Each structure stands twice: as structure tokens, then as C-alpha cells.
Amino acid sequence: MNDDQPDRFLKLDEVKRRVGLGKSMIYRLIQEGKFPAPYKVTPLASRWSDQEVRAWIDDVKDGFEGKKRTI
């Protein structure tokens, strides 16, 4: 993502779709400091930074680069 573009906020369903993880796993990773925490935009609503989620995806892909699955 270009740094000149404004950041968007994502709902949990969009975050789950993008990263392929469920709600429980996302919140477990947040507690472990391994996934970006959401921002409280209202007392009842949390949203994730699109840029932070994209950066996490890139970090995960970089961590597995060169490692192929064996069957």
C-alpha cells in the first residue's frame, strides 16, 4: 500500500476474511503481541488499521519465504 493513501479501518469480518483466521485465533494472537490490536472507535465498536493488517500479512509471508510444504 502506498503511504500517500489514507488508512482505512476494517471490521472484524473483513480482517478474518483477509487473514484466514477466526475470531478466537485473532484475539489470541493479539494477547500474545503477534497481531495488531484494534482501535476502539466507539465504546461498542473496534476496527483494525488496513495498513497494519497488510503489514502483518507481509511479515507472515516473509517468515515463510523459502519454506515449502512437504507432503
Give the location of each predicted region:
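Polyanion-binding surface elements
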Residues: M1-M25, E32, Q51-E52, D58-D62
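Short, solvent-exposed alpha-helical "recognition" segments
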Residues: E32-Y39
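Short secondary-structure boundary/hinge segments and terminal tails
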Residues: K34, R47-W48
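Short Lys/Arg-enriched helix C-cap and helix-to-coil transition segments
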Residues: Y39-A45
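Short, charged recognition helix plus adjacent turn
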Residues: F64-I71
